[in-house]
Amino acid sequence: MIKENTLKIFLSNGITLTVKENEKIFIKGQEESFAELYELIATCISNKNNVEFSVEIDHEYEDENKKKKHQVVKHEYFIPSEKITWFMIEEV
């Protein structure tokens, strides 16, 4: 079994965000790296700005006829700045 890298972001308001290596991160409509997301969160906390980003997940599955299918699911995140005082990232 191949291990897939997963990064977890723990926020001070109790929310945990999980982003897997194969998921695409979008900030203001542009695809970005996990490092860019980290920088966005750090900057927003210090500047007291809201954090907005989305994650697209390409799910691959088999239908009832055993044909491979793809479904892209988009998750939008909006985190008010006053809700976050610190964050921590862990690779699992």
PLM-predicted stretches and their roles:
Residues 1-92:
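Eukaryotic intrinsically disordered, low-complexity regulatory linkers and tails enriched in Ser/Thr/Pro
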